[in-house]
Amino acid sequence: MTLDMDAVLSDFVRSTGAEPGLARDLLEGKNWDVSAALSDFEQLRQVHAGNLSPPFSGGSTCPKTPEKGGSDREPTRPSRPILQRQDDVIQEKRLSRGISHASSSIVSLARSHVSSNGGGGGSSEHPLEMPICAFQLPDLTVYKEDFRSFIERDLIEQSMLVALEQAGRLNWWVSMDSTCQRLLPLATTGDGNCLLHAASLGMWGFHDRDLVLRKALYALMEKGVEKEALRRRWRWQQTQQNKESGLVYTEDEWQKEWNELIKLASSEPRMHLGSNGASGGGVESSEEPVYESLEEFHVFVLAHVLKRPIVVVADTMLRDSGGEAFAPIPFGGIYLPLEVPASQCHRSPLVLAYDQAHFSALVSMEQKESAKEQAVIPLTDSEHKLLPLHFAVDPGKGWEWGKDDNDNVRLASIILSLEVKLHLLHSYMNVKWIPLSSDSQAPLAQPESPTASAGDEPRSTPESGESDKESVGSSSLGNEGSRRKEKSKRDREKDKKRADSVANKLGSFGKTLGSKLKKNMGGLMHSKGPKPGGLGSGSGISSGTETLEKKKKNNTLKSWKGGKEEAAGDGPVSEKPPSESVGNGGSKYSQEVMQSLSTMRIAMQGEGKYIFVGTLKMGHRHQYQEEMIQRYLADAEERFLAEQKQKEVERKIMNGGLVSGPPPAKKPEPDGGEDQPSDSPAEPKAMAFSTAYPGGFTIPRPSGGGVHCQEPRRQLAGGPCVGGLPSYATFPRQYPGRPYPHQDNIPALEPGKDGVHRGALLPPQFRVADSYSNGYREPPEPDGWAGAPRGLPPTQTKCKQPNCSFYGHPETNNLCSCCYREELRRREREPGGELLAHRF
């Protein structure tokens, strides 16, 4: 900050007693207009005094002022002029999108309220005492179609939604049971802190801008009482992964790895992006901080910070540009706060989505009074296989690393069986089985890697996954043939997991490596083992055993349906506890756990009539959330009306003032012109459901764009899928909007009826699909293009601006792109021609 701004901030803090962080937020929200910020401060204190504890109750050396003592401070208000600099404009832009950005002052009070509830990271207590909160979107179905589409593309991470739904990972349960609510990913800033942003959005509705969660995460890893237990769980899982790839760490290397994990969680920025970098909210900024990206272990630690389970919905494989899977994605699954007693934890899980190296919060939408839909999150995939339970094994303080790791007896004593995992889920969450109608069927998930089955965690503990399969495939009578079959199956699984682990370690090198890996290890990659249910190739003895067990379980399901839950739940397992499922210690689990085990086994054999889900508790909104949403909706309506007005102005410029008739470039559309024109009300909806995803970075804003360039921050760059590309293909990173106003009239890039590729007829500045692909780069300037006239459309002529040597086009009134932009700017400065005041 400059000296003047320091002085303004000091005066504001001295006159109000506000915390410096809150004072800065208020001043920045009003462009450093002190009078306006003071007015905001007084209004908020009076409105929210009964609901929010004063955010400046501690940590400030300035005396507190009475709640309604605004008149006492009136004479001390500074009479400085409004100060503004480029950084403040950037901050204002950054706070101009999304529900939490509608009123920075309200959110600042709420953030301060949250942070004031936290304790010291080094105390015996948890860094934060979290109330049970779950944010819900307002009911958008009450609004008109065009306005609803505008809000959806502003608030919802459309590309992530489409990608995960098409991959069969998200909302597949809605198609199986219409009483379940759809979950939607909220648009989240991609600055390296997206995990904590997503968690904060999912609970409170605003980003973790003050890094409250990140600081708590770091404190718990560095000096929390659970530090050593968390480290053992991490080292155990990492050791199993290292075994698969043949890696052996020394003690120094283990310490270095652990220190690196802690360092990643630090709240210190990694770097500052330049003017062409990707920053939160799509704003070019030289001061926007970027933080280190976090790993799956940090999700596990976050569950302990929040004292609540976390469920991450993600695809299981990373795919190259051709849709080929070449590396596993380890994030998907369940993270339980296992080092906190279940009685002290919230039982409603926080649900996050992960796609293309980016986290988002998954939230439901408010319902009408008459609606009976329930908010749930399945704990299995669409094939009824239990999701990975991450970092569930703690070998204990007495574990001798390097020695006990190779002792099969010791290993067998700590591997978790399916029964143990179900017991943990019942302990930490409110779970239930949702019955399905006879004709319902889950959409198939995307094809896995040639190695892994749908729910297997490629980087999770191999023994844990094998234990699941063992519990399902083995008879309750402990048949020897079944055990032999399981041993041979484990050998095959080990070979497959080895290939997966190698792909995981090296997969980031891209498509070429993935192709070579699969080519050179084809024997391993394509030798698929039996399904997780244990059905498939095997000895005659095991087949007979499976048939017997299958019949018994069918009877179990029928009796449960008839209401005899107690007898049916204990039936198949009460004859003899499953001794081959090690890790249960011989203890008998509750009736509910045994019922879940029986139903899970049946479901995993392809006869599932139920979905195993955790219930999501949706509490009442806090008053600050209600006001935050109402202000956002009012702000969104303003922007929507301004956008409609701008489209009308552009249409007049294009059709009335500059172009005498329909643009000739629109004529050769091969599909009968199915696309809507740019001013059609259907456009927001079409843009809202694009595919692919630009990753965890923000796409730079092209210069000179009008409101049509102001698409949501993480909108799809590549547009809808065309040609024969699969829906999960990764597209080049491009800006989603139209970089120049004339791009509305670009012909389709598919070959026309005459076989000529229409995009090839256009000069480079008019080619959208292949004009630029790097998300960090501004679109290339077209002004220097000087192609030969023989390649131009017949109507293209020299720019009509005197002394300009470039070519124009009828759609730009025969002006080159540079002169055309200058003409638009000139028109905007005329009365009635101003553009939107809001910029994303």
From Swiss-Prot:
<keyword id="KW-0378">Hydrolase</keyword>
<keyword id="KW-0645">Protease</keyword>
<feature type="binding site">
    <location>
        <position position="804"/>
    </location>
    <ligand>
        <name>Zn(2+)</name>
    </ligand>
</feature>
<keyword id="KW-0862">Zinc</keyword>
<keyword id="KW-0788">Thiol protease</keyword>
<comment type="subunit">
    <text>Interacts with TRAF6. Interacts with PARK7, leading to inhibit deubiquitinase activity. Interacts with EGFR, ITCH and NEDD4. Interacts with TRAF3. Interacts with ZAP70 in activated T cells, but not in resting T cells.</text>
</comment>
<dbReference type="GO" id="GO:0043124">
    <property type="term" value="P:negative regulation of canonical NF-kappaB signal transduction"/>
</dbReference>
<feature type="region of interest" description="TRAF-binding">
    <location>
        <begin position="152"/>
        <end position="401"/>
    </location>
</feature>
<protein>
    <recommendedName>
        <fullName>OTU domain-containing protein 7B</fullName>
        <ecNumber>3.4.19.12</ecNumber>
    </recommendedName>
</protein>
<feature type="active site" description="Proton acceptor">
    <location>
        <position position="358"/>
    </location>
</feature>
<dbReference type="GO" id="GO:0016579">
    <property type="term" value="P:protein deubiquitination"/>
</dbReference>
<dbReference type="Pfam" id="PF02338">
    <property type="entry name" value="OTU"/>
</dbReference>
<dbReference type="GO" id="GO:1904515">
    <property type="term" value="P:positive regulation of TORC2 signaling"/>
</dbReference>
<dbReference type="GO" id="GO:0006508">
    <property type="term" value="P:proteolysis"/>
</dbReference>
<feature type="compositionally biased region" description="Basic and acidic residues">
    <location>
        <begin position="456"/>
        <end position="471"/>
    </location>
</feature>
<feature type="domain" description="OTU">
    <location>
        <begin position="183"/>
        <end position="365"/>
    </location>
</feature>
<feature type="modified residue" description="Phosphoserine">
    <location>
        <position position="471"/>
    </location>
</feature>
<dbReference type="GO" id="GO:0003677">
    <property type="term" value="F:DNA binding"/>
</dbReference>
<keyword id="KW-0597">Phosphoprotein</keyword>
<feature type="modified residue" description="Phosphoserine">
    <location>
        <position position="464"/>
    </location>
</feature>
<feature type="binding site">
    <location>
        <position position="816"/>
    </location>
    <ligand>
        <name>Zn(2+)</name>
    </ligand>
</feature>
<feature type="active site">
    <location>
        <position position="191"/>
    </location>
</feature>
<feature type="region of interest" description="Disordered">
    <location>
        <begin position="653"/>
        <end position="710"/>
    </location>
</feature>
<dbReference type="GO" id="GO:0035871">
    <property type="term" value="P:protein K11-linked deubiquitination"/>
</dbReference>
<keyword id="KW-0863">Zinc-finger</keyword>
<dbReference type="GO" id="GO:1904262">
    <property type="term" value="P:negative regulation of TORC1 signaling"/>
</dbReference>
<dbReference type="GO" id="GO:0032717">
    <property type="term" value="P:negative regulation of interleukin-8 production"/>
</dbReference>
<dbReference type="GO" id="GO:0008270">
    <property type="term" value="F:zinc ion binding"/>
</dbReference>
<feature type="binding site">
    <location>
        <position position="799"/>
    </location>
    <ligand>
        <name>Zn(2+)</name>
    </ligand>
</feature>
<feature type="binding site">
    <location>
        <position position="819"/>
    </location>
    <ligand>
        <name>Zn(2+)</name>
    </ligand>
</feature>
<dbReference type="GO" id="GO:0001701">
    <property type="term" value="P:in utero embryonic development"/>
</dbReference>
<feature type="region of interest" description="Catalytic">
    <location>
        <begin position="167"/>
        <end position="440"/>
    </location>
</feature>
<keyword id="KW-0479">Metal-binding</keyword>
<feature type="modified residue" description="Phosphothreonine">
    <location>
        <position position="730"/>
    </location>
</feature>
<feature type="region of interest" description="Disordered">
    <location>
        <begin position="49"/>
        <end position="88"/>
    </location>
</feature>
<feature type="compositionally biased region" description="Gly residues">
    <location>
        <begin position="531"/>
        <end position="541"/>
    </location>
</feature>
<dbReference type="GO" id="GO:0005634">
    <property type="term" value="C:nucleus"/>
</dbReference>
<dbReference type="GO" id="GO:0071108">
    <property type="term" value="P:protein K48-linked deubiquitination"/>
</dbReference>
<dbReference type="GO" id="GO:0004843">
    <property type="term" value="F:cysteine-type deubiquitinase activity"/>
</dbReference>
<feature type="short sequence motif" description="Nuclear localization signal">
    <location>
        <begin position="483"/>
        <end position="498"/>
    </location>
</feature>
<keyword id="KW-1064">Adaptive immunity</keyword>
<feature type="region of interest" description="Disordered">
    <location>
        <begin position="440"/>
        <end position="592"/>
    </location>
</feature>
